């Protein structure tokens, strides 16, 4: 609720900065909004029918430490963001992560884990041209071949991923789930 209220207030303020006109309708990309709504409905449906509970239970059977659990959750967003964008990866996997953390009795770690997942999604998405809109724009602007793009971005994405694993290992250590 708080985020919605703040967003609405900021939207109203922006109307005074850029007065509403006929162009406002063109700012809304209905197809994108429809796709995101459909994705959120699917994720909500998965949650309601217990898919997250089933997969989460299996995940918790496989990992024995918080470090392993968090690395797995962050890796989900890291790798999926390379192909489905960072935003879609987060919309898809954050509800799953929250459900798993609750099942593990670790809900107090939710903000930290979601923050690490967000970093992971951004680090993963920077590797590929389709990982985020900025990369698509840069690739189109420069006409750079995909393999060249990957070659340029791989050291940065790889280094950031290693640093993320180090942070997770230090913060969570070998604490049992």
Task: Mark where each language-model region is.
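Interfacial loop-to-helix junctions that mark the boundaries of transmembrane helices
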Residues: 2, 21-32, 146-156
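Hydrophobic alpha-helical transmembrane segments
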Residues: 5-6, 33-34, 67-75, 89, ...
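Membrane-interfacial loop-to-transmembrane alpha-helix junctions, especially the N-terminal start
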Residues: 1-5, 110-111
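Hydrophobic core segments of alpha-helical transmembrane domains in multi-pass membrane transport
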Residues: 5-17, 39-44, 76-78, 121, ...
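Juxtamembrane and boundary regions of transmembrane helices in multi-pass small-molecule transporters
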Residues: 108-111, 115, 147-177
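Alpha-helical transmembrane segments and, especially, the helix-loop junctions at the ends
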Residues: 81-91, 111-142, 164-170
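Membrane-embedded alpha-helical segments in integral membrane proteins
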Residues: 10-21, 132-142
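Membrane-embedded alpha-helical segments and adjacent helix-loop junctions characteristic
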Residues: 19, 23-107
């Amino acid at each position: 609720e708080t985020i919605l209220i703040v967003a609405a207030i900021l939207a109203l303020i922006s109307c005074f900065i850029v007065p509403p006109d006929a162009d406002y309708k063109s700012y809304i990309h209905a197809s994108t909004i429809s796709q995101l709504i459909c994705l959120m409905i699917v994720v909500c449906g998965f949650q309601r029918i217990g898919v997250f509970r089933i997969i989460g239970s299996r995940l918790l059977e496989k990992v024995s430490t918080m470090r392993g659990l968090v690395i797995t959750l962050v890796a989900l967003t890291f790798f999926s963001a390379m192909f489905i964008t960072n935003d879609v990866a987060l919309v898809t996997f954050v509800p799953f992560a929250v459900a798993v953390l609750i099942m593990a009795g670790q809900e107090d770690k939710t903000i930290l884990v979601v923050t690490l997942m967000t970093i992971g999604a951004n680090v993963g998405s920077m590797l590929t041209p389709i990982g985020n809109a900025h990369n698509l724009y840069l690739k189109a602007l420069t006409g750079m071949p995909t393999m060249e793009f990957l070659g340029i971005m791989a050291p940065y994405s790889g280094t950031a991923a290693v640093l993320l694993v180090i942070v997770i290992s230090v913060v969570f250590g070998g604490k049992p789930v």
